[in-house]
């Protein structure tokens, strides 16, 4: 029985290391089993290089039909788990068919890699970048090892960033004017604004501002939409009067935000909204939602 169990053990150990891995920023990433691991951070147009070590277990040799390393950018829908859509696929053949008797090291390099999308782990979808090493074998089955890495892309300040100003209300009952200082915010930004009451004929007991994330996956009849409330702020407690102005000041730094993602590879989108909620004394809710754009500022070091 022990012999049979041993037959299914891999013949070798494969490890993947990055050339500058020790000096590069590490980002926490959640695995499928919920475990948090640290992976190195890159951005588009960087060179991905390092070494692959293949070491046969004691007393074993590895017969193979070639060794290759792939750099893959993949999208996985959780309702179609296990099926990956590759939007980036680069391959390096690093060994010809032969045998490995002892530890062998292979250098690899992918120069100036185009990585247009950021790593994303959502409710129904994930986008990941991974190095995949394959020791190709026939009857014995190929041996495969993966190493994830994280991609974040930075952009400069937008040249145009208009404020958001809108008047909303219920006829003859409630009219408010809200204003936010910008329509585009970086991930460490502060949302500034004000809520101005033009007409108040219903008894409002409190007002909140929510930050919401809406993730859309799939297309057409197969579209899945998930909305999360990431943060909620009480702007006012008590009844406002006509002419009253309520300030808005929201720091984005504490929250787990990503940039806005628009129709990534025709697979998914991630949008953010500011949702203004007013509650009257009869617990009726009045709300107005406004989309904002989030981006990762180039000057950020995180």
Curated annotation (Swiss-Prot):
DNA-binding recorded as keyword: no
Biological process terms in GO annotation: intracellular protein transport
Transmembrane annotation, as ranges: none
UniProt KW keywords: Cytoplasm, Endosome, Golgi apparatus, Membrane, Protein transport, Transport
Recorded GO CC terms: endosome membrane; Golgi apparatus; intracellular membrane-bounded organelle; membrane; multivesicular body; retromer complex
Topological relation to the membrane, as annotated: Peripheral membrane protein
Domain of life from the UniProt record: Eukaryota
Cellular localization per UniProt: Cytoplasm; Endosome membrane; Prevacuolar compartment membrane; Golgi apparatus, trans-Golgi network membrane
Subunit structure: Component of the retromer complex which consists of VPS29 (MAG1), VPS26 (VPS26A or VPS26B), VPS35 (VPS35A or VPS35B or VPS35C), VPS5/17 (SNX1 or SNX2A or SNX2B). Component of a retromer subcomplex consisting of VPS29 (MAG1), VPS26 (VPS26A or VPS26B), VPS35 (VPS35A or VPS35B or VPS35C).
Free-text function comment from the UniProt entry: Plays a role in vesicular protein sorting. Component of the membrane-associated retromer complex which is essential in endosome-to-Golgi retrograde transport. The VPS29-VPS26-VPS35 subcomplex may be involved in recycling of specific cargos from endosome to the plasma membrane.
Sequence similarity: Belongs to the VPS26 family.
Protein name: Vacuolar protein sorting-associated protein 26A
Source organism of this protein record: Arabidopsis thaliana
Lineage: Eukaryota, Viridiplantae, Streptophyta, Embryophyta, Tracheophyta
Encoding gene, per UniProt annotation: VPS26A
């Amino acid at each position: 029985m022990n012999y049979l169990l041993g037959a299914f053990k891999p013949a070798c150990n494969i490890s993947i290391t990055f050339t500058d891995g020790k000096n590069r920023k590490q980002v926490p990433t959640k695995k499928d089993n919920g475990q948090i691991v640290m992976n190195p951070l890159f951005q588009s147009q960087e060179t991905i290089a390092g070494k692959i070590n293949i070491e046969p277990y004691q007393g074993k040799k590895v017969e193979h039909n070639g060794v290759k390393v792939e750099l893959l950018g993949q999208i996985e829908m959780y309702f179609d788990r296990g099926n990956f859509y590759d939007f980036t696929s680069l391959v390096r053949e690093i060994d010809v068919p032969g045998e490995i008797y002892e530890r062998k090291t292979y250098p690899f390099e992918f120069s100036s890699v185009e990585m247009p999308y950021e790593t994303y782990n959502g409710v129904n979808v994930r986008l990941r970048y991974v190095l995949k090493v394959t020791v190709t074998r026939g009857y014995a089955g190929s041996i495969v090892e993966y190493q994830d890495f994280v991609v974040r892309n930075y952009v400069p300040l937008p040249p145009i960033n208009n404020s958001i100003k809108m008047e909303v209300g219920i006829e003859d009952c409630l009219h408010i004017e809200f204003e936010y200082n910008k329509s585009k915010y970086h991930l460490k930004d502060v949302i500034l604004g004000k809520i101005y009451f033009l007409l108040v004929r219903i008894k409002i007991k409190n007002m909140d501002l929510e930050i919401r994330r809406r993730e859309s996956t799939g297309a057409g009849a197969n579209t899945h939409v998930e909305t999360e409330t990431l943060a909620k702020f009480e702007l006012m407690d008590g009844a406002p009067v006509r002419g009253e102005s309520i300030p808005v000041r929201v720091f984005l730094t504490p929250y787990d935000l990503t940039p806005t993602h628009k129709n990534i590879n025709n697979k998914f989108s991630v949008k953010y909204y500011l949702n203004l909620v007013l509650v009257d004394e009869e617990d009726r809710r009045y709300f107005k939602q406004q989309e904002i754009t989030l981006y990762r500022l180039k000057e950020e070091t995180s």
